[in-house]
């Protein structure tokens, strides 16, 4: 249970760092950052592998890069939806 909570906290931090790199604000606050961190870790692992330091099952650098990619794509989608409305 404790490792799951640590993983969620790491996912939140990764999501916040990814959104800070891209400069987009995530919808959903902390929950949005957690989702971005988890999906970013998945994207980063798929694209870049597991190089670099690891914390709570997350390869830090690929996860941050993946979160930045995810937040950037999410920002493009939301911008497109706002323009259509």
From Swiss-Prot:
It comes from the Bacteria. It is found in: Cell membrane. Keywords: Cell membrane, Membrane, Transmembrane, Transmembrane helix. Its main location: membrane. The keyword Cell membrane applies. The chain crosses the membrane at residues 2-22, 28-48, 58-78. One of its GO terms (cellular component) is plasma membrane. InterPro entries: Transgly_assoc. It is a multi-pass membrane protein. Pfam families: Transgly_assoc. The keyword Metal-binding does not apply. Belongs to the UPF0410 family. This is UPF0410 protein YdaS. The lineage of its organism: Bacteria, Bacillati, Bacillota, Bacilli, Bacillales.
